[in-house]
Amino acid sequence: MHGPHNKIWLFIALATVLMAINANADCPFVDIQSVNPTIVVELRYAGTKNFVNHPLYPQGTRALVRPEVAAALTKAQTTLRRYQYGLKIWDAYRPVSVQTKLWEASRNIDHVANPEVGVGSLHSWGVAVDATLVDSWNRPVSMPSDFDDFTPAAMWRYTGSSFEVHRHLRLLHWAMDRAGFWGMRTEWWHYTISDWKKFLPEEARQSAHLQGTHWKGKL
């Protein structure tokens, strides 16, 4: 599960990303699993396991991100494989139309980004993912909460979990941080590439600057 195989996957991922960038500069997103098939994908908004309790994505929707984000995810996956764990992606690129539906269903200004304010959700720019851990058999492991949890258990610094859950969360956060992601204090599963602002148009970058840091980001 580790050693030379991880290096091969990392090389393939980087090569795939470079080809994607060079092949079509006008199409900024790549399929995470086309870059690294070992990363598990379970898009929660393609099913009912989300806070609106019904699908928002059509069946067959792929997990898309910026090519640079896909390369960083492969780095995180390589780190986790050394410890017999791996990534599962719950969400990646999210169309503004879906973000609008989430906002209309919630109107929770503390947790859900209004797509018409500032930069909206960073998912809509392909620079953020929602991720959790799986074991070496791609089975889910214990984490502080499920996806789209608005209770204190979703907080990154929540202290009510067991030692095993804390260990899993620390491992996920460490691997993602090492790969170049920032976490979100209100959603342990949400990660944004640290240099996300450079992928936004100038006007959006100005809005992001006025909006604040990544710690104030929302779903």
Annotate each PLM feature.
Residues 3-4, 19-21:
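Short, low-complexity interaction segments enriched in Ser/Thr/Pro/Gly
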Residues 95:
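Segments that shape or occlude catalytic/ligand-binding pockets
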Residues 98:
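Short, well-ordered surface patches within globular domains
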Residues 10-19:
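Bacterial N-terminal signal peptides
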Residues 21-90, 102-186, 194-219:
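Extracytoplasmic cell-surface/polysaccharide-interacting catalytic and binding patches
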Residues 191:
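Conserved metal-phosphate-binding beta-hairpin within the catalytic cores
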Residues 2-10:
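Bacterial N-terminal signal peptides that target proteins for export
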